[in-house]
Amino acid sequence: VKIALISPAHPLRGGIAASSERLAIALQEAGHIVTIYSFKLQYPAFLFPGKTQYSEDAAPLRLHIVPLLHSLNPLNWFISGRVIAKSRPDRVIVRFWLPFMGPCLGTVLRIVRRKSAPGLRITALTDNIIPHEKRPGDLLLSRYFAHSCDDFVVMSRSVAHEIEYVLGAPTLVRLTKQSAIAPIRYAPHPVYDNYGSAMEKTAARTALGITAKAPLVLFFGLIRAYKGLDLLLEALQYTPHIHALIAGECYDDWAAYQKIIEQHHLSERLHLHLHFIPTEQVKLYFSAADLVVQPYKNATQSGISQIAYHFGVPMVVTKVGGLPEIVAHGASGYVVAPEPAAIADAMQDYFTHHRSEWMREQVRAARGRFSWENLVKTLLK
């Protein structure tokens, strides 16, 4: 099958780009021909508070990536639609994660359909359809996009219900396995297995400049208000023996977090790496950590959980969105309320009762259900 995958990809950075590149490899391994149609311009400056949208990593091998789309240029949308249609794909898979992309992607897909042979199927791999940080007009933009698609694959059941809401038609939601083909299908986010093998813990900590042998929890990824770093910092006041490694570029005003750090005298127990983490360094952070903490205030699915699964690190996640679907409470980690005391209790239990060895075994045992083969199969049903 010849597949057009419309998604950010190298040299653009971030979780969507990285996972789409890995998906393209999985599709190719399944015998399909894949072209990734990426963006010449993805975000305007007002939507991207980070330092750069571009990765310094080497381009992935064996992938055909075409930088084509411009999110702000309607003329480009029509041209892009014609270019993709001219390649005569048998299937189109499109990533959707932000309502801002609705006009661009919705228009491109309508042009692709109009210029293609009848029967072309367009499947949206939908990370989010209602964003974590809401803006006026989100619903209209997402609805415009959604009506350009034939079906949807979600990696969190909460997103399925959001699609139901956006389309205004409850009968569209079909999450059961009985249906061979359904408007909305579910497959959990696969494990990120493209970050190399785990390192020995002491070596990883040394490489990161961490000399302390204390229990170490990891908060990893871009720092935004909904990800709840403030909850973790508040929780650390109850666990004076635990250190925290904070790794990721801050998209918020750091002053609010610094105030909590100073209020609870946390500086000596924090290891701050407040920058975007390149691909080749990811293994250092997960190898150094005893426990990954995701204190999110709202979420759908999370790629961070799947990196933790790859490196065999247990997790503390909060009872929001699709996170409880990914972590088995008391086995591969803890599922707790998004409150400092609950997060602190989970961390305390893990270290006080020496749960590392057993929980790491559970994490390794659970990895099998998060396969790329399963996602490919679900997308192409």
Regions found by a protein language model. Give the residues of each.
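A short helix/loop element that forms part of the nucleotide-sugar donor recognition site in Leloir-type
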Residues: 170, 196-210
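A charged, aromatic-enriched C-terminal amphipathic alpha-helix characteristic of glycosyltransferases
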Residues: 355-381
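Nucleotide-activated donor-binding/catalytic signature segment of Leloir-type glycosyltransferases, i.e.
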Residues: 257-283
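Acidic donor-binding loop of glycosyltransferase active sites
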Residues: 284-301, 310-313
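Conserved acidic donor-binding segment of nucleotide-sugar-dependent glycosyltransferases
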Residues: 329-341, 348-355
